[in-house]
């Protein structure tokens, strides 16, 4: 029945050939075309920007600086250097070799990566070449030889885990494999001459002399890690947008903006925004911890994550509070979508792998939020709080100042709209009184009703001309 009623002619609607459409069809067509055009341009520009952040990304992997320290000082260290020379290129991290005097211990190498001086590090173990030479001779040295006690590589697994595992860890594992080949090329003849061929363990040591050992800072293997700097940046922004739209609607419906003083409105909105940002940050921290699996984060990490997310949430509240006060509602989606894409683009990939143009994203709050979270989750490593926290608080202070002007604009606009609505009703009442005085004295209510129905019927009928017979 519903489908049939859709095709039945309506008796109380304006016909498409009615004079109502005169001058409106062209305007409707132009407005519709402009809306479609602007939406296409919006998505083209924003998605081009987002895709541009990772455009030709593998060719910039060489910007990952990896510390190389040779504690061995023998043929295994030479093998690692030889392997790097074979693999060196734009798609491979750059090994920066430093002397043992600069990094005298393995812990000092680890701390260099932790500080963020390097994205990773590779070091050979002390006396690794001597142990291998002794193993080739057979005996107890061969049976106890461990190829994993030759090379160790380090990286901070919390920092951009998808890129770190794909372009850093995998390449360092490959480096160790090529180092074995380089060892056979450099020392294969000498090793074969000293090999005890009757000892199976010695032969095994020659066939598999080198194996890399991974020593990541804060292993981050949970599947949800891919969301932390992608979808995780979108959710806080959307939550605050929905909150602002909701509180705007409630304030308008309850006539708070037009009836209450500005200061009262400001206190109410500020209090509600702080409470919602606090609870929303708790929700986000909660579902992050709920799916952390075996991730070794602590209770203090939970509290710090909650607090920095609270700050980020409130920054986004200020952003939408300001936009919705000064920008017409039909244009708000354009700004919301653009703000989301810009923030996600700033955090989705390390700037070492993006074109230099995108580094202006250091000024965006999402980038600084993710840097602070990396520091929290990696037990203080990759500490860029000296840059990130001042930028975040600058956004918050700017928003606090802007919220004063947005509240003034919001209250003034509500008062102005109320006065215009009041004036409109007054004009309608005055016009109605004038029409009542102009009606003939003996006109009955029934006659007026018949005339109204007749005029209404004529206005809805198609405007056609009938030929006289």
Q: Across the structure, where does each feature detected by a protein language model lie?
A:
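Membrane-spanning alpha-helical segments of multipass transporters and channels
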Residues: 222-243, 247, 254-440
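Extracytoplasmic/periplasmic domains immediately adjacent to an N-terminal transmembrane anchor
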Residues: 2-223, 420-469
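Short, functional N-terminal and low-complexity linear motifs
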Residues: 13-19, 32-33, 45-51, 252-256, ...
């Amino acid at each position: 029945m519903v489908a049939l009623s859709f095709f039945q002619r309506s008796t109380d609607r304006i016909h498409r050939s009615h004079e109502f459409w005169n001058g409106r069809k062209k305007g409707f067509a132009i407005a519709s075309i402009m809306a479609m055009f602007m939406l296409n341009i919006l998505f083209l520009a924003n998605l081009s920007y987002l895709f541009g952040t990772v455009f030709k990304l593998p060719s910039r992997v060489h910007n990952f600086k990896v510390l190389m320290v040779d504690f061995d000082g023998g043929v295994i260290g030479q093998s690692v250097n030889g392997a790097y020379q074979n693999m060196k290129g734009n798609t491979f991290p750059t090994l920066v070799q430093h002397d043992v005097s600069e990094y005298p211990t393995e812990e000092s190498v680890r701390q260099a990566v932790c500080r963020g001086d390097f994205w990773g590090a590779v070091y050979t173990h002390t006396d690794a070449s001597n142990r291998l030479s002794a193993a080739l001779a057979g005996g107890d040295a061969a049976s106890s030889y461990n190829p994993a006690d030759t090379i160790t590589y380090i990286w901070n697994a919390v920092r951009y885990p998808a890129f770190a595992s794909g372009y850093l860890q995998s390449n360092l594992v490959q480096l160790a494999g090529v180092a074995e080949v380089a060892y056979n090329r450099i020392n294969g003849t000498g090793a074969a001459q000293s090999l005890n061929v009757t000892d199976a363990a010695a032969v095994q040591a020659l066939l598999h002399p080198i194996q890399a050992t991974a020593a990541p800072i804060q292993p981050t293997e949970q599947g949800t890690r891919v969301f932390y700097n992608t979808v995780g940046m979108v959710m806080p922004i959307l939550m605050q947008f929905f909150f602002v739209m909701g509180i705007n609607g409630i304030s308008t419906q309850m006539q708070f903006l037009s009836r209450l003083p500005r200061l009262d409105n400001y206190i109410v909105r500020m209090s509600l925004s702080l409470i919602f940002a606090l609870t929303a940050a708790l929700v986000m921290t909660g579902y992050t911890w709920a799916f952390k699996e075996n991730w070794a984060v602590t209770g203090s990490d939970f509290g710090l994550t909650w607090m920095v997310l609270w700050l980020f949430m409130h920054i986004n509240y200020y952003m939408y509070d300001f936009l919705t006060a000064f920008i017409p509602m039909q244009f708000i989606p354009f700004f919301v979508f653009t703000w989301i894409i810009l923030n996600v683009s700033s955090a989705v990939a390390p700037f070492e792998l993006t074109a230099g143009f995108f580094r202006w994203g250091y000024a965006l709050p999402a980038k600084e939020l993710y840097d602070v979270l990396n520091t929290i989750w990696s037990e203080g490593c990759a500490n860029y709080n000296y840059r990130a926290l001042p930028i975040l608080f600058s956004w918050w202070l700017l928003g606090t100042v802007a919220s004063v002007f947005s509240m003034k604009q919001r209250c003034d606009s509500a008062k102005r709209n109320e006065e215009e609505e009041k004036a409109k009703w007054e004009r309608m009442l005055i016009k109605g009184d004038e029409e009542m005085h102009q009606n003939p004295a003996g006109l009955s209510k029934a006659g007026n009703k018949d005339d109204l129905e007749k005029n209404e019927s004529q206005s809805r009928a198609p405007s056609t001309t009938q030929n006289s017979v």
